[in-house]
Amino acid sequence: MQAGLRIDVDTYRGTREGVPRLLDILDEAQVKATFFFSVGPDNMGRHLWRLARPTFFWKMLRSRAASLYGWDILLAGTAWPGKPIGRDLGPLMRRALDAGHEVGLHAWDHHGWQANAGRWNDRQLTAQIHRGVDCLSDILGNPVICSAAAGWRADQHVVQAKQAFGFRYNSDSRGATLFRPLLADGRLGTPQIPVDLPTFDEVVGPQLQPGAFNEYILNRFAAQRLNVYTIHAEVEGIVMADGFRQLLRQADAREIEFNPLGQLLPESIEQLPCGQVVRGHLPGREGWLGVQQ
């Protein structure tokens, strides 16, 4: 059974500690994945103001965020400038590429994108993407071939802004099938590879304990599904690393074969159906996100 494995790297600590551990785990399992890196300042701690929103407060309690992520991640960029992830930790991003994994852009400023992408104008969106692409391409020594919007904060406005960068594909949305978004001028845009499986932090809580997660998520894989699964370097690369190692073993026993997302694309993208990325909501995730329509 074919599946796509996507690894989002949101923070400085996730890059420094989570990525090396994940590379070792993936090497042990002989699995290749797609890493999406945040490369600018780590300002993730600025999300704390969202605690005033009941849905975000409940999510933080439900997922036991302090123990799951660590206070250094939860406070990053609050009382001090965010550390420059790409400048300091670029060699770890190159290491992922050299190990045979697919590497793409997550964001320049992950917090900035999540907080503002829905209201930035065309110029601001393009500038953010441009900064990220320039930084990551300098680090890798290669063009950036794919991207994934931070927090799945994407809509048709974001889709249009990304067209100028010539990505092979984007993974900006939650959905069920590969598709090409319809652009304002009637053309079909860059292919979208949506995520169709929930993440650890979306489902773990009072009704599902961490130890039961692997069986829960593996039971969601099916031959007729897209089977794109997302992990986070800050979670599965640190506190849940042993659980992820076990998940890969259990997936192998079920004949689930993980691949980089780019390998899910057909030889000809002309056969992909048309769709759109619109704003929607998902259980377990606070705020809006891009969903396939």
UniProtKB/Swiss-Prot annotation:
One of its GO terms (molecular function) is hydrolase activity, acting on carbon-nitrogen (but not peptide) bonds, in linear amides. GO terms for biological process: 4-amino-4-deoxy-alpha-L-arabinopyranosyl undecaprenyl phosphate biosynthetic process; lipid A biosynthetic process; lipopolysaccharide biosynthetic process; response to antibiotic. Keywords: Antibiotic resistance, Hydrolase, Lipid A biosynthesis, Lipid biosynthesis, Lipid metabolism, Lipopolysaccharide biosynthesis. The keyword Hydrolase applies. It catalyses: 4-deoxy-4-formamido-alpha-L-arabinopyranosyl di-trans,octa-cis-undecaprenyl phosphate + H2O = 4-amino-4-deoxy-alpha-L-arabinopyranosyl di-trans,octa-cis-undecaprenyl phosphate + formate. InterPro entries: ArnD (IPR023557), Glyco_hydro/deAcase_b/a-brl (IPR011330), NODB_dom (IPR002509), Polysacc_deacetylase_ArnD (IPR050248). Its EC number is 3.5.1.n3. It is an enzyme of class 3 (hydrolase). Gene3D superfamilies: Glycoside hydrolase/deacetylase. Pathway: Glycolipid biosynthesis; 4-amino-4-deoxy-alpha-L-arabinose undecaprenyl phosphate biosynthesis; 4-amino-4-deoxy-alpha-L-arabinose undecaprenyl phosphate from UDP-4-deoxy-4-formamido-beta-L-arabinose and undecaprenyl phosphate: step 2/2; Bacterial outer membrane biogenesis; lipopolysaccharide biosynthesis. Pfam families: Polysacc_deac_1 (PF01522). The keyword Hydrolase applies. GO terms for cellular component: membrane. Disulfide bonds: none annotated. Residues 1-259 form the NodB homology domain. Catalyzes the deformylation of 4-deoxy-4-formamido-L-arabinose-phosphoundecaprenol to 4-amino-4-deoxy-L-arabinose-phosphoundecaprenol. The modified arabinose is attached to lipid A and is required for resistance to polymyxin and cationic antimicrobial peptides. Belongs to the polysaccharide deacetylase family. ArnD deformylase subfamily. HAMAP family: ArnD. This is Probable 4-deoxy-4-formamido-L-arabinose-phosphoundecaprenol deformylase ArnD. It comes from Pseudomonas savastanoi pv. phaseolicola (strain 1448A / Race 6).
